[in-house]
Amino acid sequence: MKKGSRHNFVVSQENWTLHRKGYQDQRRHQEKVKEAIRKNLPDLVSEENIIMSNGREVIKIPIRSLDEYKIRYNYDKNKHVGQGDGDSQVGDVIARDPSAGQQGPGKGQGAGDQPGEDYFEAEVSILELEELLFRELELPNLQQKEEDHLVVEHIEFNDIRKKGLMGNIDKRRTILSAIKRNALEGRPGLIPIYNDDLRFKTWNEVVRPESKAVVLAMMDTSGSMGRWEKYMARSFFFWMTRFLRTKYETVDIEFIAHHTEAKVVSEEDFFSKGESGGTICSSAYRKALELINEKYDPARYNIYPFHFSDGDNLTSDNARCLKLVHELMESSSMFGYGEVNQYSRHSTLMNAYKNLKDPRFRSYVLKEKGDVYRAMKTFFKKEEEAVS
């Protein structure tokens, strides 16, 4: 460029490769997947892929509200209509969908001639679902009890000392100390640095008291609990255990399975083994009271019994159940009863509980898979939500 020229030139470098475009498309797609997960959370929570994953970090789940992009052929072969600058008014019908009255994909027994629904199968981490589900949940009526556990919440570096680990050296304060000492000795500057100039950051553990709690998970495993009923109950308890272990460090969980008799079982047996026989729900409540008397003093523990059944209890046992539920509530922060009743049939147990007015008693009837999510929201809703 000639001397004295007034023209200014700016050399810029921009990434015009396809890699940048691909990254933007990928990020936009991930945002769409997350939005679809939020909208479909009630259905996704009870997906069999999740419940049977044994807590694996990443799983594949179908998201039916997110289409798989592809070229579709127009089978109607009709001429299409556009809207121009004519004399049309708001509300005028400009065209009708010729396929509006046709039969779509359904769930009937006969064979159809329509294409099925396309859906996107996304890889989702359990942690993502937990973050969305657990953010609105908490143990209700959690109170401070005797002999609370002290839990280390975090570490604070809030003190400076002359002795410590070299990994915790405070460089800024060490340099300032050396400069001040050298200046007082008439040698302005940083060097030399002596051991007496070294400053180290030290920490304190910030602890908070956390009340102890125990959840008594009771499940009906009798013959009347079919495969779907047991799957729904186990789906709820699957998310309940993950919720408790994610948000609370001092919560014990006891697993009780019952038919006509109740017994304390391991977590693995609770989620995998099936049984048969009749149904006497009071046996589970008696076993829960035994555990409370033997191991969980109400003065030291917040107690939360949860019972899931299909409601098909021995009629003569309902009065005993009602009496034992009252006894459990006297020592509990909340009692939760979930009933898996897909076809709204008559339930002898829910009929006995319908007049319970104690605020510590909460119940929910599960009729479809999405009700697992709604039951979690009912039993573990936050206090401000409960008040409002």
Curated annotation (Swiss-Prot):
Residues 103-113 have a biased composition (Gly residues). Residues 80-117 are annotated as: Disordered. Belongs to the UPF0229 family. HAMAP family: UPF0229. This is UPF0229 protein BH1031. It comes from Halalkalibacterium halodurans (strain ATCC BAA-125 / DSM 18197 / FERM 7344 / JCM 9153 / C-125) (Bacillus halodurans).
